[in-house]
A protein has these predicted regions:
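Membrane-proximal helix-loop-helix interfaces that form the catalytic/acceptor-binding platform
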Residues: 2-509
């Protein structure tokens, strides 16, 4: 049965794997992994070393098999599927085979897991490492052995270099290990391993504090809205790529009710018997589910916003574990099984529509632009981030067309299409320098050589967002005003997360 569920996870992950366009962050995966090892390490160092192991893996695969979306996404599918049997081992060790199967099937059909399995980012690996580290911690607690705890420490070290939010899992894991372990030797070992782990992860901690990623992340401070989004996400609701529906709200309500029942069960057990083997599962699951979001909220309030659903995917397996533990205690057993089936119907109802929804449809936007382009056309990219995937798709389309496709010249600033090294140079260009290249005098120069200019924009901020988001938005408005000094708007085309505007010199004002 576990093999079948692992196969189900692989099938759900590989289904239509390449049909959804790469989105902004996946473009950065391609951009980074396409560099040499020295370049990858330098980029990772500037961002707290997070994703370094992941980028190196994708770098090897690109070298072997090319840079298609399938190649870059396949490792995430496999990582997410690998978490499924580990979830069974964890839940079965805590509460028996039936609960193990419940937790396994719930995780396998979790929409957020499947969605991020189909992304060329590290989030599925975070789920795998979260489950693996928790399993090692449980074995160490139950067996009173230091060997599994050493494994736990090593997994957490790799996890922190994969994504720094894995640090949020340390506190709930150590809290449970201290409270539920009856071995003084294990507790002393935990303290020692924590000190060693802190030294191993010191580069992550120091760079994360000073990294520009955390200083310029365009996230607002946490609030009720973002908390609801994260709660829906952890309940395996949609919302990342598709609008939240009544099904998502129902799924959140059911999951929340089961979690509350779990809290009541744990409280009663602790009053009657204290921390023991029988309630370890609920104690661990609830701490794993609740504490990382709470800690993330507090960190975000300190000025380093990271209160975002996908950053907390490390707690996603905990929801499946808690639900399985609660349903496993329901009597008669048929009632618990009915509850599982009822919940799975909602999860499949959320999962099915999410396959067709891209986060950013760079693929279609770029293809349509190139299909409509004429000789003498130019294109300007509204932000350096959007340039990455425009170059990725335009270069691939040009290769497949065998030179028969018109490639507009990139202007404001001028750039060469398709080279990851060139794109990286623009991606690192400060916003102020980028805006200077789009001032009226440079637009005037472009007007002498461009009959039409396509404005390609994505993630250009918001007038009501964070300070960084507002800065990007004002930059876009300035660019549009400058273009209209010499060109007349001739069309607007909107896609998921991407917009393309056409400006025509032959129909300029006056």
């Amino acid at each position: 049965m576990v093999v079948a569920l692992t196969g189900l996870s692989l099938g759900l992950g590989f289904y239509h794997l390449s049909s959804r366009s790469l989105w902004l962050d996946e473009g950065y995966t391609w951009l980074t992994a396409a560099q040499n090892v020295k370049g990858i390490t330098a980029i990772a160092a500037s961002q707290g070393y997070h994703l370094l192991p992941y980028y190196l893996l994708i770098h090897v695969l690109i070298g072997w098999f090319g840079d298609s979306a399938f190649v870059m996404r396949a490792p995430s599918v496999i990582a997410g599927a690998a978490a499924v049997p580990l979830m069974y081992l964890l839940a079965a060790r805590l509460a028996g085979r039936r609960v193990g199967l419940y937790a396994t099937v719930l995780l396998a059909v979790s929409q957020p897991l499947v969605f991020w399995q189909q992304n060329a980012r590290d989030y599925a690996f975070v789920v795998l490492l979260a489950v693996a580290s928790t399993l090692a911690a449980v074995v160490g607690i139950q067996d009173g052995s230091l060997g599994p705890l050493i494994g736990w420490a090593l997994i957490m070290a790799v996890g922190c270099y994969t994504h720094p939010e894995m640090l949020l899992l340390v506190i709930p894991q150590e809290l449970v290990m201290f409270l539920w372990s009856g071995s003084r030797r294990v507790r002393v070992g935990i303290v020692g391993l924590t000190m060693v782990g802190a030294l191993l992860n010191l580069p992550v901690l120091l760079n994360a504090v000073h990294s520009s990623v955390y200083q310029t992340t365009p996230l607002l401070p946490p609030g009720v809205g973002s908390a609801t989004e994260i709660a829906t996400f952890l309940a395996s609701g949609a919302g990342t790529a598709v609008p939240v529906t009544a099904t998502d709200h129902a799924l959140l309500g059911i999951t929340f009710a089961l979690a509350v029942i779990g809290v009541a069960m744990l409280g009663a057990d602790l009053v009657d018997r204290g921390c023991n083997r029988s309630n370890l599962g609920l104690g661990l699951g609830l701490a794993w589910l609740v504490l990382p979001p709470v800690i993330s909220w507090l960190v975000s309030e300190s000025g380093h916003p990271d209160f975002l659903d996908r950053y907390l995917i490390l707690s996603l397996p905990a929801a499946s574990l808690v639900i399985a533990l609660v349903l496993g205690r329901v009597q008669p057993r048929s009632l618990g099984l009915f509850g599982l089936v009822y919940l799975l119907i909602f999860r499949f109802g959320v999962l099915a529509p999410s396959y067709s929804a891209p986060l950013d449809d760079f693929s279609t936007a770029t293809a349509d632009l190139l299909a409509a382009a004429r000789p003498g056309d130019c294109v300007t990219i509204a932000s350096n981030q959007a340039r990455t995937l425009y170059d990725y798709y335009s270069a691939r389309l040009a290769r497949s067309a065998g030179g028969r496709l018109t490639q507009p010249v990139q202007v404001l600033p001028f750039a060469v299409n398709g080279s990851p090294q060139v794109v990286l140079a623009f991606n690192d260009l400060p916003l102020g320098d980028y805006r200077n290249a789009q001032q009226p005098q440079f637009v005037a120069q472009a007007a002498t050589g461009c009959r039409r200019i396509w404005l390609f924009q994505s993630h250009v901020g918001s007038p009501t967002g964070s300070a960084t988001s507002q800065l990007f938005y004002r930059s876009l408005l300035t660019l549009e005003r400058n273009l209209q000094l010499y060109f007349r708007p001739a069309g607007q085309f909107n896609y998921h997360g991407v917009a393309v505007s056409l400006f025509d010199r032959d129909r300029r004002p006056g």
